[in-house]
């Protein structure tokens, strides 16, 4: 980062005093962010400016924004971050942590809820996607599941541990079949809730379990672009917070 600060200063036609001012502000920026540019480190830096007078904040933010744009132009950043002055202390959101999902395999009488939880936590499906899964979407020979959402279709590998939970659901039209019809969203919510409550993890909502799937995939080295395809999303916008 120090080399890039020097390169940035050299790229500007400014006086010696201005060079010193830019260098001081950017070195301070580097120390606070530890050379890492992401939403959390930038928010931390913005918070350090809260005690300064507006004019000083404006000067430092201008220097940093110019530097960030320089890094973006030089291909050192995937996107351009533009900082604004904070008007009040902000809470730094901690990045969610990967949790141990082994309790999902607990032997239970709530098999519907358990299967729903496994499909969310280990395949990243949403309850609405699970509700639309048909028996024809499941291929046990190749251990894959086809998920169709609108005009998009994706084929997901099924972890072998989940196969036994699906093999007994091949008698109807849908994997979760109500006499040839799908169950309501409320039914899926209730089944999931009763299962996670029974294992002492009532905080494991569908959203939380899907987030755990995302975090687990990122930990394995998957890129956001790969996750967009796996999750059937149109863009990576909703995944940016996990970078």
Q: For each predicted feature, which ranges?
A:
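N-terminal core-binding DNA-recognition domain of tyrosine recombinases/integrases
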Residues: 2-90
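DNA breakage-rejoining catalytic core of tyrosine-based enzymes
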Residues: 77, 88-103, 151-160
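Basic, Lys/Arg- and aromatic-enriched nucleic-acid-binding interface segment
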Residues: 98-127
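Short, charged phosphate-coordinating catalytic segments
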Residues: 119-142
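Short, basic interhelical loop/turn and adjoining N-cap
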Residues: 136-137, 182-185, 233-240
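Short functional hotspots where side chains directly engage DNA or cofactors
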Residues: 143-148, 216, 225-243
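C-terminal catalytic core of Y-nucleophile DNA break-rejoin enzymes
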Residues: 148-193
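Short, basic (Lys/Arg/His-rich) helix/loop patches that form interaction surfaces
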Residues: 191-229, 233
